[in-house]
């Protein structure tokens, strides 16, 4: 009798486990529903670096491309690769876009939304004044920080660095409303 009781208890435990597992699997196995999908690009090499939710429920896409006017891109290439920023609404429709660059390669590193609804973006630049860049190079490479308004228009820009290599890796908002650059 002692040998039967543990076996029955074990069998009941297994049955209960299977029932719970089956019920849980059915609840969690529901396929997610695709709300929308969107392919955005040029006929050249496009690199997406960031996708962020915006305060209006849309999305900001940031990356870089060697493509000129083609596909979805409406602005010419300035040289090498240019930063490419695309604002989407909540349904994935393009609201605006901006291609920002110099005569050399400009690969977007980060983009964050600002409290006024605009955007702060940046890259590492080794180029002087050319294309959209209005400030001279300081060192071998510098932070190039650009402020866009909520419509994607450049409001201001700043070149930051020393005499050597300064490579931007991150833009982080801080509670005071400013930003940390690293």
Which functions belong to the PLM regions below?
Residues 26-182:
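A sequence-level/structural motif corresponding to short, flexible coil/turn segments enriched
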Residues 1-32:
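Bacterial Sec-dependent N-terminal signal peptides
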